[in-house]
Amino acid sequence: MKMNLHCFANLISIMILELFSNSGLINATEVGKRTDALEASAWNESKWISAVDAPVVKGHNNGRAADGASWFVSTVKNEQKIVSAKWMTAGLGVYELYVNGKPVGGEFLKPGFTHYAKTKRSFTYDITDIIRTKPNAENMLSVQVTPGWWGDKIITPGGYDGMIGKKCAFRGVLELTFSDGNKKRYGTDLKNWKAGIAGPVKHAGIFDGEEYDAREPMGYECVDKLSTPEENTEFSGDILPSDGAEVYLRTDLALAPVKAYVWKNVEGAKENEFGKVIIARE
């Protein structure tokens, strides 16, 4: 029996590369609190948007997803004092949220696995405690999206036709409640958002892990490189609130090894890819 550690090694590399950036543990200081989704009709006030310059897979390419990470950025100016702020979000691809440069939510590999053409899970956060609430103050919303769950080989086992031509996309609705009780919603659109390929993530896939260049600034730090997005019409399925099967970093479950064993007379026992770069092209 030959021991195949490829999948486990890849999973470990994903977790490590998701955790670290040039500023340290980026997901260990997440802000925002999960809350109930807005009513489903709120999605009508938004569009799926993609970066015009986002690369796409044009052929099978050995199952490799398109390079680069799509970034989406918008700045919202308060018309009045804010007393409540909720952000309902969904992504075509694995996505990470930021408000004024701070990561929102502690989930990993959001939105998780669903049938890529039928259903996408949404995540809604109460971000009242982290936004600037004074009148005329500005808040920057930003999102990174990579191909996982949407445009990489995990969605099409046995064939890669499903990943051809797909662009990462983001959709969201910000609901602000003002001090006078009135509410206003800001959905993703082509006028108030910017998009482009940027940031330190140069390639990402569920099975393949990430290529990460920590010398590069985050997408919200180089907005001048972004431009007007385009509407994405590739997904026509349902957007449903997450059902509670998310992945979190559980430091409370960390265990320290007491003993270690080396198995002898087992074929492939010492064959593994720990510590090696396994995603890079040869």
Question: How would you describe each model-predicted region?
Answer:
Residues 32-80, 90, 241-282:
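Solvent-exposed, flexible loop/coil segments flanking beta-strands in beta-rich domains
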Residues 62, 67, 72-214:
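Accessory beta-strand-rich segments of carbohydrate-active enzymes
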Residues 7-10, 31:
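Short terminal (N- or C-terminal) low-complexity/amphipathic segments
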Residues 183-282:
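Activation corresponds to long, low-complexity, non-globular regions
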Residues 26-28:
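Boundary at the C-terminal end of the N-terminal hydrophobic targeting segment
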Residues 10-22:
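Bacterial N-terminal signal peptides
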Residues 1-7:
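N-terminal secretory signal peptides that target proteins for export/translocation
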Residues 6, 23-24:
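Short glycine-rich, low-complexity segments
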